[in-house]
């Protein structure tokens, strides 16, 4: 789902979208996002700052080298990285891990590009992990566990074209 205001913004946007051109920069930008601490009822802090630690970054870089982790990048007219997302793509499923934006709407643009890319290659679904108002505004829905497991089974059994995650540009 693309709202009327987002569609209007997209039509005016001069951004360039790429896949797997700057994975390291995207995960680093995602890790730099200030996040509020998550506090349990007993007062203990579960997360203070980012969950994307250096060891996580290193692990995802290894997954990227193995062609399992991928990034969507959004570049402005000055060729600066201003938004993006990364996650793990296995056959017909993409599990999003994190996204960032420096300019307004650019993480939304990265997500829309991911959806279109998955549609182009007949991917089955994108696992956003946690529902939130931002994702809901883009049409993301929660599915019951049994339905999720069915889709996951179908998606991981699919064989996708070898060029799906090659570095490339995306046209919306």
Which stretches of residues belong to each language-model region?
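N-acyltransferase acceptor-side catalytic subdomain
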Residues: 1-172
